């Protein structure tokens, strides 16, 4: 899991892990969510990967375009950081 830079200083995403056909996002509450090509879809996942690497706009994108359309909520974990 890599730390999300969050250049804007606002937002709920704290970390991410990019996989070939998916991305895992960690949020402020330490919950992790898997987004993949089947849900929410390839276009959204690829855009999320770009924003994650850029360190800006990911939380806004998730809130506006993805919301609860994730593949799976993963077990709550202790922070990776």
What are these regions (language model features)?
Residues 1-81:
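A charge-rich, low-complexity, intrinsically flexible signal that marks solvent-exposed coils, linkers
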